[in-house]
C-alpha cells in the first residue's frame, strides 16, 4: 500500500506540467514541448491522437482502435513535433494491450474511450510527460477555456501540409444542455452524460480528420487537466454543432480499475464560469444550420450522420449524394460522413449505411 501510494503521489506531482508552454494562439503550430502528453498513433501512418497518462499508458478514443485485430499493427510516438521531418525528442513504443470501454457503442459513439498499454515505460522529460485527468467531481462550465491539439486535417478536404507540424487551437466549453439542443436536429439521444462539448457557434475551429483520440485540456493554476478525448462532430466544425468529446471525469473508476500500478494523476477541475442550467430553453442559432432536415420529419437514428475524426484512409474516393460516403477497404472499415442531408435523402440512400 505504501509503495502504491508513493507511485500515485509521484505521478500527481508530474502530471499536467508543460514548462515549455507559453500559452497559445488558436490554429497555430505548437512550439516543441508545449503539449508533452500528446501522442501520435500509427498503423502504417498517423491515424489518431492520444494522451500519455502515466509512464506506460495512453488514453485515446475507442473508435480509433476498436477495428484493430491485434496490437502489433499499432505504434505510439511520443515527443513528436511533426510527421515528416526528424524529431530529436521522439521515442516510440509498440502496444501490447488495448482495452476498450465495455460500454462503447459503435453507432452512437457513447463511452468512446480506450486505454493502450505500451511495450515498456517511457522516461519523462520536458517533451514527454503525462497529463492530469479530470476527477469524477470536476466541473467544466459554459465558456471555460480549453485547447485541442493534433495532426488532423486543417479543413474538410485539406490535409495537414508538410512537414505536418502539431497544431493547437483554442475552444470554449459548451453546456451539455445547449449541446443536446444543437444535436437534436439529428437525434434527441446523440449527446449523453459521458460526453463534453466544446467549440464556437460560428464553427471553423476545432478537431478534424486525424485528431480523434487527442486531448481537450483546460488549465488550472500551473496544471493542465484532460477534460475530454476527441470523439466526433458534424463535418469539420460546422456552425452550431460543437465538437464532441468523451468526458474523462466520467471514467475515473474504469481507468483506475485497469491501471493498478503507477496510477494516473486525477485532479478536480473547478470552473468559475456560468453553470449549465438544464431546464433552460435552447439558444436559437443565428447562423444557417449545417443540416437541412425538413419540418415535421423525424431523422433516422443513425449516428452515421456524423463523423469520428479518425484518419485511417486518406486517399479514399468520395461519392457526394448530399452526404459523403467513405469506404476503407484496408481493415474493412466503413466511415459515414455528413454533408447537408435530410430525411428523404437518407431514405433513398439507406443501403449505404452499414456499420
Model-derived regions: residue spans:
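Conserved active-site neighborhood of the chymotrypsin/trypsin-like protease fold
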Residues: 58-62, 110-135
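Extracellular trypsin-like serine protease catalytic domains
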Residues: 18-25, 38-42, 144, 149-306, ...
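Conserved H-D interstitial segment of serine endopeptidase catalytic domains
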Residues: 17-21, 58-61, 66-106, 176-184
Amino acid at each position: 500500500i505504501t509503495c502504491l501510494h508513493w507511485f500515485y503521489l509521484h505521478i500527481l506531482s508530474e502530471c499536467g506540467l508543460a514548462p515549455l508552454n507559453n500559452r497559445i494562439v488558436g490554429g497555430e503550430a505548437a512550439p516543441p514541448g508545449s503539449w508533452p502528453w500528446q501522442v501520435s498513433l500509427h498503423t502504417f501512418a498517423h491515424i489518431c491522437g492520444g494522451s500519455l497518462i502515466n509512464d506506460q499508458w495512453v488514453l485515446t478514443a475507442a473508435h480509433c482502435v476498436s477495428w484493430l485485430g491485434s496490437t502489433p499493427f499499432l505504434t505510439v510516438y511520443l515527443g513528436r513535433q511533426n510527421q515528416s521531418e526528424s524529431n530529436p525528442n521522439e521515442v516510440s513504443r509498440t502496444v501490447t494491450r488495448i482495452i476498450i470501454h465495455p460500454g462503447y457503442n459503435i453507432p452512437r459513439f457513447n463511452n468512446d474511450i480506450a486505454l493502450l498499454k505500451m511495450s515498456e515505460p517511457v522516461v519523462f522529460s520536458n517533451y514527454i510527460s503525462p497529463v492530469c485527468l479530470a476527477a469524477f467531481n470536476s466541473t467544466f462550465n459554459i465558456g471555460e477555456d480549453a485547447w485541442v491539439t493534433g495532426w488532423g486535417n486543417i479543413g474538410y478536404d485539406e490535409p495537414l501540409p508538410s512537414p505536418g507540424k502539431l497544431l493547437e487551437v483554442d475552444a470554449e466549453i459548451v453546456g451539455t444542455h445547449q449541446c443536446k439542443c444543437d444535436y437534436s436536429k439529428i437525434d434527441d439521444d446523440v449527446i449523453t452524460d459521458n460526453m463534453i462539448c466544446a467549440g464556437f457557434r460560428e464553427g471553423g475551429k476545432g478537431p478534424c480528420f486525424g485528431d480523434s483520440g487527442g486531448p481537450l485540456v483546460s488549465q488550472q493554476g500551473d496544471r493542465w487537466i484532460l477534460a475530454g478525448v476527441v470523439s466526433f462532430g458534424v463535418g469539420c466544425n460546422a456552425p452550431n454543432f460543437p465538437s464532441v468529446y468523451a468526458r474523462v471525469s466520467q471514467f475515473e473508476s474504469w481507468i483506475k480499475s485497469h491501471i493498478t500500478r503507477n496510477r494516473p494523476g486525477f485532479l478536480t477541475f473547478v470552473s468559475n464560469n456560468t453553470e449549465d442550467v438544464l431546464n433552460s430553453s435552447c439558444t436559437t442559432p443565428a447562423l444557417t444550420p449545417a443540416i437541412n432536415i425538413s419540418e415535421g420529419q423525424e431523422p433516422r437514428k443513425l449516428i452515421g450522420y456524423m463523423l469520428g475524426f479518425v484518419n485511417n484512409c486518406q486517399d479514399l474516393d468520395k461519392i457526394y449524394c448530399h452526404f459523403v460516403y467513405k469506404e476503407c477497404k484496408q481493415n474493412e472499415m466503413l466511415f459515414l460522413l455528413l454533408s447537408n442531408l435530410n430525411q428523404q435523402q437518407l431514405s433513398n440512400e439507406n443501403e449505404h449505411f452499414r456499420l
